[in-house]
Amino acid sequence: MPVDQEYIYSLLRKYKDRTATEAEKEELVSWYRQRAERDSVFPEDEHVVAESMRVRLHHEITRPQHDRRRQWLAAASILLIIGVSVGLYLRPTAGVDPGDITPGSHQAMLVLVDGTKISLTEAANGNIASQENIQITKSGDGQLIYTLAPNRQGTATASGYNTIETPKGGQYQVVLPDGSKIWLNAYSSLRLPLNFSEGAERRVELKGEAYFEVSHQPTRPFTVVSGQHAVQVLGTHFNVKAYADEPDIKTSLLEGKVRVTAGTHSVTLAPGQQSRLAEGNITVAEIDTREAVAWKEGYFMFDDERLEDIMRSVARWYDVEVVFDNDALKEETFGAVTTRFTRISTLLEIMEQTGDVQFRVEGKTIHISSKQPV
């Protein structure tokens, strides 16, 4: 029997006003799950952001849920989306604030071995450089493709490194001659050898964060180096997060097997595990790998994360500075799932509805303070 639309809107208003009972919240979650199977919850042309979040969350809640906490996060995120959506639905329609901060996009700089800089943001699609035995091509969907020149297959004459740098607010994908794919996150850099011929060492250097899908070649290990930290694989899918402004380096394994070394320490990871290098020591823990690679899939996924850690990711993606009114706010924790491709005002509204903090945007600076009682 169809649920009365006016009744649902009354529940939505209660939830928005924080007067909904636990039973009413459960009813909203049940209703949302049923609607998510058929169509969008609100008119798509008016609520693109809500729909985008709905699609992402639908992927999460339809997967098997064995962990009680994971079930809670999914339900809480549904209510979060409902809350934001109804807020958008109930408030008067207004134009987009021209001062609002837009999300990141495909942006990067390619620095050739001779120091030449090529803006991948501005360069036309097609061949952008030829060096020794490789050709470098830019595609129209944010990819930089390395291929061996047809007359140089199997040779190993080139030497030196090119570097790909993403700014704050940028990301890019690289395809190597061996078929390996690398997704580079915001404010990161990747040094790539010119020589990827057969027999050459497959070794790259990373600062920042990247996701790797390495083609399997039993006789040619693939090594990712970040300072004194190294990950060696034969063929696998994994994520490395090695930002200079973070206290640790994290390697998360999705498929295959990797070996992580740092100094005299070494560990081997199995799928679903994450190594953490901090103060010279490596620890290993079981994780939900979806959180580690959410950025690569186009969304933020926070599960009881510290606000300071969350805002580091936000600052890199939106190219903003973050100021906390007091250090205690850095320890606030949040859990949410939301698209990365929305204006920052929407993201901050989501976070305000799920925590005890409030945000004030001044230019490219976000000020965070305690939420004032109503």
Spell out what each predicted region is.
Residues 12-16:
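Regular secondary-structure segments
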Residues 67-74, 85-374:
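A residue-level detector for the "anchor" residue at the start of short, highly conserved motifs
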Residues 19-20:
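Charged, low-complexity interaction regions
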Residues 2-11, 25-29, 33-103:
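Membrane-interface anchoring determinants
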Residues 23, 39-41, 80, 154, ...:
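Amphipathic alpha-helical interaction segments
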